[in-house]
C-alpha cells in the first residue's frame, strides 16, 4: 500500500489514462505480460486510482470550458497556453524503455497555475506500455507552429516528455478552429460594415464640401453681376444726360445761326428795296447793330463761363466751333455793311486835297473793284490796279502800297552794324595796337574770261584728222613710224607754270605755282667729299 500511495503521489497530472481498464492501449511485450500476472492486486488498485483521476480531470475540463465560453477574454489566454505546450511534447518510440530516468515538465491543456510540476528527483518505474496512446485510433498529425523549450533539463540530458492525450488535442484543435471561425465570421462583416460606413461618410463629406464651394462661388458671381449692373446703369444715365445736353446745345446753336442769318438777310433786302433815305439809315445803323451784337456776345460769354464748370470737353469743343462760326458770320456782316456804306459815305465826304487822300481814295476804289467777286452785288470785271514800290521795286495793290512803302523805307534806311567780338575783346588791351583794323576784304573782281572757243574748235578738228590718218595707215598694213609725230593738244584755258613749264587748270595752277617756286629756289645740297 505504501508503494501504491507513493506511486499515486508521483503520478503525472498531464497523463491521459484510458476510460476502460479492459482495453489494452497498444501491443504488449513478453515482459509486460509476466509483470501483470505476478502483480494482479496492484493492477486493481491502479484501475481504481485511474478512474478517480479521470473523473477529476473531466470535472476540471468542464469548468474550464464553461469559463472560456462565458469569458471571451480567456479564449486568447487558453489559446496562448495551449499552443506552446502542444508543440513542446515529443513522442517516445515504441521500443524505448519506459523505466528510464525522466525529468520533463508535464502540463495540462489549462493554465499552468492549476497543475503542479512533477518532482525531478523521483523516478516512476513503468512498463514499456505507453500510457494514453491508443494504437487503434491514431492521432492527427501535429503541426508545430512554435517550438517551445521546456526550460528544465534532466541530470543525464534525456527528457521524457509525455504526449497530450488524444481527446485533449482534438478538443484544443477543434476549439481553435471554432474560435477562428467564430472570430472571422463575426469580425469580417463588422469590419466590412465599418469600412462601408466610413467610405459613405467620406463621400458625404466630400460632396458637402463641394456643394459649399459651389454655393460660395455662385454667391460671389451674383454679387459681381449686381455690382456691374449698378455701374452700367450709372454709366447709361450719365451718357443719356450728356446726349441730352449736346442735343439742347445743338438746337440752341442752330437757332442762333438762323437768327443771325435772318438779321443778315433783312438789312440787304432793306438796302435793295428802299430809297436814298433808307440808305442813310443803313449807313448809320451798323454801329447800333454792332453794339447790340457785342452786348449779346458778352451775355453769351457770361452764361458759358457759368456752365463751363459743369460741362464736358465735348461740350467745350462744340461751343468753340459755334463761337468761330459766329465770329466769321459777324466779320462777313461787317464787310457787307462796309461795302454798302462806302458809296453813301463818298457822297457826304469832302474831296481830299493831300496825296495821301488820293492814295486812300484809290485804295478804296480798288477794294470796291475787288469786293464784288466775293459779295456778288456788282458785276464789274475790271482788273485791279497795281503800284510799284520805290524802295524795293515790288508791285502791290494801291490800298496796300502806302503801308508797305512806309515799312520798306525804314528797313532800307537803317543799316545795322555787325558786331565784331574780337575787337570787343581786344579793346583796352595791348593786343589792340597789333590788330589790323581793316574792314572786310572786298571780293576781288574776277576779270572776264576770254572766249577761246575758235581755238578749241580748230584743235579738236586737228586731232580728228590725225586720228583718221592713223586709222588709214593701220588699215593698209603700213608702219606708223612713217607718220609725223602727233603734237600735244594745247588748251587755251590752261595756265603754264613758269618754273616747271607744265600746264594746269586755273585753280590748280594757283596752288601749284607757289609750291613749285619754293622747291626750285631751294639751295642745292652740299657735295660730299670722299677722302
Swiss-Prot record:
Cofactor(s) needed: Zn(2+)
Binding site for Zn(2+) 2: 497, 500, 512, 516
UniProt-annotated binding residues for Zn(2+) 1: 389, 392, 404, 408
Alphabetized UniProt keyword annotations: Coiled coil, Metal-binding, Repeat, Zinc, Zinc-finger
Record's compositionally biased regions (Basic and acidic residues): 293-305, 335-345
InterPro entries: Znf_C2HC_C3H (IPR049899), ZNF_C2HC_dom_1C (IPR026104)
Zinc fingers classed as C2HC/C3H-type: ranges: 385-414, 493-522
Keyword Coiled coil: yes
Residue ranges the record marks as coiled coil: 209-264
Pfam hit, one: zf-C2HC_2
Disulfide-linked positions: none
Superkingdom of origin: Eukaryota
Compositional bias segments (type: Low complexity): 35-44, 366-380
Composition bias, Polar residues: 306-315
Residue span of region Disordered: 16-45, 290-318, 334-387
GO molecular function: zinc ion binding
Claim: Acetylation is one of the keywords in the record: no
Family: Belongs to the ZC2HC1 family.
Protein name in UniProt: Zinc finger C2HC domain-containing protein 1C
Amino acid at each position: 500500500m505504501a508503494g501504491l500511495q507513493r506511486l499515486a503521489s508521483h503520478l503525472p497530472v498531464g497523463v491521459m489514462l484510458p476510460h476502460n481498464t479492459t482495453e489494452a492501449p497498444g501491443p504488449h511485450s513478453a515482459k509486460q505480460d509476466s509483470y501483470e500476472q505476478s502483480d494482479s492486486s496492484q493492477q486493481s488498485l491502479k484501475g481504481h486510482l485511474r478512474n478517480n483521476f479521470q473523473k477529476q480531470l473531466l470535472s476540471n475540463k468542464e469548468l474550464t470550458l464553461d469559463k472560456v465560453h462565458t469569458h471571451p477574454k480567456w479564449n486568447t489566454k487558453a489559446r496562448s497556453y495551449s499552443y506552446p505546450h502542444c508543440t513542446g511534447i515529443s513522442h517516445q518510440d515504441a521500443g524505448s524503455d519506459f523505466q528510464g530516468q525522466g525529468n520533463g515538465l508535464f502540463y495540462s491543456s489549462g493554465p499552468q497555475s492549476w497543475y503542479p510540476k512533477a518532482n525531478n528527483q523521483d523516478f516512476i518505474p513503468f512498463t514499456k506500455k505507453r500510457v494514453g496512446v491508443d494504437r487503434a485510433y491514431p492521432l492527427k498529425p501535429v503541426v508545430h507552429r512554435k517550438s517551445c523549450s521546456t526550460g528544465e533539463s534532466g541530470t543525464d540530458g534525456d527528457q521524457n516528455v509525455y504526449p497530450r492525450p488524444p481527446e485533449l488535442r482534438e478538443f484544443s484543435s477543434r476549439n481553435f478552429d471554432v474560435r477562428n471561425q467564430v472570430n472571422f465570421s463575426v469580425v469580417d462583416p463588422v469590419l466590412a460594415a465599418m469600412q462601408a460606413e466610413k467610405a459613405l461618410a467620406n463621400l458625404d463629406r466630400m460632396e458637402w464640401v463641394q456643394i459649399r464651394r459651389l454655393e460660395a462661388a455662385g454667391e460671389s458671381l451674383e454679387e459681381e453681376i449686381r455690382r456691374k449692373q449698378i455701374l452700367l446703369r450709372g454709366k447709361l444715365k450719365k451718357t443719356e444726360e450728356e446726349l441730352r445736353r449736346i442735343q439742347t446745345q445743338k438746337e440752341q446753336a442752330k437757332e442762333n445761326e438762323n437768327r443771325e442769318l435772318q438779321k443778315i438777310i433783312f438789312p440787304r433786302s432793306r438796302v435793295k428795296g428802299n430809297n436814298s433815305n433808307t440808305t442813310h439809315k443803313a449807313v448809320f445803323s451798323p454801329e447800333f447793330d454792332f453794339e447790340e451784337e457785342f452786348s449779346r456776345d458778352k451775355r453769351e460769354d457770361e452764361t458759358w463761363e457759368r456752365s463751363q464748370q459743369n460741362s464736358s470737353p465735348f461740350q467745350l469743343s462744340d461751343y468753340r466751333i459755334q463761337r468761330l462760326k459766329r465770329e466769321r458770320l459777324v466779320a462777313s456782316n461787317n464787310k457787307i455793311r462796309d461795302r454798302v456804306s462806302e458809296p453813301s459815305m463818298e457822297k457826304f465826304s469832302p474831296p481830299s486835297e493831300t496825296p495821301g487822300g488820293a492814295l486812300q481814295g484809290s485804295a478804296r476804289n480798288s477794294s470796291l473793284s475787288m469786293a464784288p467777286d466775293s459779295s456778288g452785288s456788282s458785276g464789274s470785271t475790271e482788273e485791279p490796279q497795281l503800284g510799284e514800290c520805290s524802295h524795293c521795286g515790288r508791285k502791290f495793290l494801291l490800298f496796300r502800297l502806302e503801308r508797305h512803302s512806309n515799312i520798306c523805307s525804314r528797313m532800307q534806311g537803317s543799316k545795322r552794324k555787325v558786331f565784331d567780338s574780337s575787337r570787343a575783346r581786344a579793346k583796352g588791351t595791348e593786343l589792340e595796337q597789333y590788330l589790323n583794323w581793316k574792314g572786310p576784304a572786298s571780293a576781288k573782281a574776277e576779270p572776264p574770261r576770254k572766249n577761246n572757243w575758235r581755238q578749241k574748235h580748230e584743235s579738236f578738228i586737228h586731232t580728228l584728222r590725225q586720228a583718221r590718218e592713223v586709222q588709214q595707215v593701220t588699215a593698209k598694213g603700213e608702219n606708223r613710224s612713217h607718220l609725223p609725230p602727233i603734237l600735244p593738244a594745247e588748251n587755251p584755258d590752261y595756265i603754264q607754270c613758269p618754273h616747271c613749264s607744265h600746264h594746269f587748270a586755273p585753280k590748280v595752277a594757283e596752288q601749284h605755282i607757289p609750291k613749285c617756286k619754293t622747291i626750285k629756289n631751294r639751295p642745292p645740297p652740299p657735295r660730299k667729299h670722299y677722302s
